[in-house]
Amino acid sequence: MKLFVGLGNPGARYAGNRHNIGYMAVEAIAADHGFGPWRARFQGLTSEGRLGSEQVLLLKPETFMNLSGQSVGEAMRFYKLTPADVIVFHDELDLAPGKLRLKQGGGHAGHNGLRSIHAHVGEAYGRVRLGIGHPGHKDAVAPYVLSDFAKADQDWLADLLRGISDGAEALARGDGAKFQNAVALRMQPPKPEKPKPAAKAPEAQAPEAAPDERSALQKLADRFR
């Protein structure tokens, strides 16, 4: 079994926040791949289903961001999962809006949700870092991540979530390259080929004159008629 965790804060007040893009990612997977209804478990909401041959549990911790590790740890203990079975979707200030990167293990870079997960299960789990951009000054970070995505963000956000859903099966089986390619195809679809110019029709040639079969004497006589 794989555990896909989407980080965010519970409640309608936070639903459209940049900080909740992790929630949005697992919700898109659940909706597009026929997962079961969301149920209250492990201090969060869970939905079960399959991605290809892999059984997958989607988890949205409802502990609020700073205590996300409590929920993740509880689910892992129940299913006897290791950090290698876990992938966390989270917002990333250090990536431009719409950019996505995979990461296995490593630090939490000050992200409070990841910090909590580190404290409960260690750092060896996988992450899908979802770029939301940086407001430019550290004092502006909290209000920025707790604000809704702007109208101008909606198109790339929709494409990003579709791409994540498209590539979810590849991600579940460990094919990170194919997952990232699925996202890239949504974010930067191939340009349509330019129509080739129509081939010019060959110019009509004037019909050849019939050969003159008159004798030299006839030609001379015709000149003086």
From Swiss-Prot:
The EC number(s) this enzyme carries:
3.1.1.29
Q: What compartments host this protein?
A: Cytoplasm
Q: Where is this region: Disordered?
A: 184-225
Tell me what reaction this enzyme catalyses: an N-acyl-L-alpha-aminoacyl-tRNA + H2O = an N-acyl-L-amino acid + a tRNA + H(+)
Q: Where is the composition biased (Low complexity)?
A: 198-209
UniProt keyword Transcription regulation present: no
Q: Which GO terms describe its cellular component?
A: cytoplasm
Q: Site annotation (Stabilizes the basic form of H active site to accept a proton): which residues?
A: D91
Where does the chain bind tRNA?
Y14, F64, N66, N112
Q: Which top EC class applies here?
A: hydrolase
Site positions (Discriminates between blocked and unblocked aminoacyl-tRNA) are N9
Q: Which family does it belong to?
A: Belongs to the PTH family.
Task of the protein: Hydrolyzes ribosome-free peptidyl-tRNAs (with 1 or more amino acids incorporated), which drop off the ribosome during protein synthesis, or as a result of ribosome stalling. Catalyzes the release of premature peptidyl moieties from peptidyl-tRNA molecules trapped in stalled 50S ribosomal subunits, and thus maintains levels of free tRNAs and 50S ribosomes.
Q: How does it assemble?
A: Monomer.
The protein's matches in PANTHER family, at most eight in alphabetical order, are given as: PEPTIDYL-TRNA HYDROLASE
The protein depicted here goes by the name: Peptidyl-tRNA hydrolase
Species of provenance:
Cereibacter sphaeroides (strain ATCC 17023 / DSM 158 / JCM 6121 / CCUG 31486 / LMG 2827 / NBRC 12203 / NCIMB 8253 / ATH 2.4.1.) (Rhodobacter sphaeroides)
